Amino acid sequence: MFGRLVVHTVVVLAVVMTLSAAGSGRQQAAAVSVCSGRPAKTVLFATGELRIHKTRQYVCALAVARKPGARREMSVSLQPRGGHAAVDRGRFTRQAGPVTVHALNRCVRVSGAIAGHSASTGWILC
């Protein structure tokens, strides 16, 4: 009787540990890269960073807070040269974005702000 209880407990613990490890791996993978493509540029500023990713046809950007937690004003703007800007603005806990634009053979300009501090790139990826 006691042996069956121990075996049952060990099996349940093994299943729980396996499921929790698999779940945390998915969360880490999602946090690593929200945008598709290769990392093209990272711009650091006081309260966070702008992350810019590029594929052949598209550019994607997001503003990530250095210390996630409380909701605060965040924004990210991505504009292809000669086109309209894609903007994500609001009160977020971790990041603003991602925003994506079609930028095949075009320069882009990226700007972002978190809690009153901002950064911008000028025209890049030309």
Task: Please report, for each region that a protein language model flagged, where it lies by residue.
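Secretory targeting and sorting signals
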Residues: 1-27
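Post-signal peptide N-terminal regions of Sec-secreted extracellular proteins
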Residues: 26-126
